[in-house]
Amino acid sequence: MDFDLIKPLLKEDAKGKIVLLVMDGLGGLPLTPDGKTELETAKTPNMDKLASQAELGLHHSVPFGITPGSGQAHLGLFGYDPVEYEIGRGVLSALGIDFDLGPNDVAARGNFCTVDENGVITDRRAGRIPTEEGQRLCNLLKEKINLPGVELFLEPEKEYRFVFVLRGEGLDGHVGDTDPQAVGKKAHIAEAQKPEAEKMAELVREFVRQGNEILKNEHPANSFVLRGFAGMPKWPKFNDIWGLNSVAIAMYPMYRGVAKVVGMTVLPPAESMSKEIDMLEKYWNEHDFFFVHIKKTDSYGEDGNFDGKVGIIEEVDALIPRIMALDPDVLIITGDHSTPSKLKAHSWHTIPTMIWSKNARPDGINEFGERACLRGSLGSRFDANDLMPLALSHALRIEKFGA
């Protein structure tokens, strides 16, 4: 997206309000060739009603056929080119827990995991240990690990996830992940991807060596993996690009982090999906763009729990009337990527998308699902970068281009 093209077209006196409701990992697959996806299986009368008044399609955020990570996928939804604006998961996780990243910091996202006697990963999430156990393990590592010449920060994120930060001179984030992102494999050795990152890579290798020795008798979290090494980027801000006063409502730190890195106001984490809508209602008069994030669709997909994912979609559907009661000008319902429970992982499949607005040209499709979206006017593989200009146009916030 050409930000310089958009900026002069923004209407200064525009009032239209936009809600971007993201069900993480929404896209799915049928378990059998003649079956339905999770979204198609779910009973969603409220979303189906909106679909009959909306424009539908399937989007992708990164080059077609490539599986996106969560951070890059969300950047696409926010109108940033995910390939140009690449960011490590560590920065997003650090910002998501309100860690104040400095100019000499490099962050990574950590997972406590379970390995066998040969160092082969048997559970990438260590049984989804509770956050309190993650805090204990972080404290244990901080207390015993010694890395001369740098400051080490370890903070729990949520459940098995933690944030790793090194602070010091001459650190560079171009270090390869130790996380193979699969069971049945050993952790990778951290390698510098550029010569200037060799110091950082050596520190990571030493951290891993000491940390594994400390955790070897713990159970189930007897090891850890790291990914997404990066420092804080300097990017154009979301509100400046789109002429909006945005706010993010998200429970999980990583998604709060991606909102922070683009300059959104981020509200305190809610305890449930219903409380997220409570926040939407509370702050409705203070903002004009609302990013509302639902995590559990992705979590159940990664766990291979088809019925659990269906249930969460149905819970979200039950909240739709509360959103519509606020009288938004535009409501976009979509996901950041697909996480089919059949695959237990992110996938390359396109993501169902609905743009409901007071100015929509309805497609006349009376359901919201992957195959219904195939018939929609937005197309079967439109670019996620197009969502923000479409949202602003539907909200009557953009002037015409050209004479």
Positions of the model-derived regions?
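Feature captures the catalytic ectodomains and active-site-proximal regions of enzymes
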Residues: 1-403
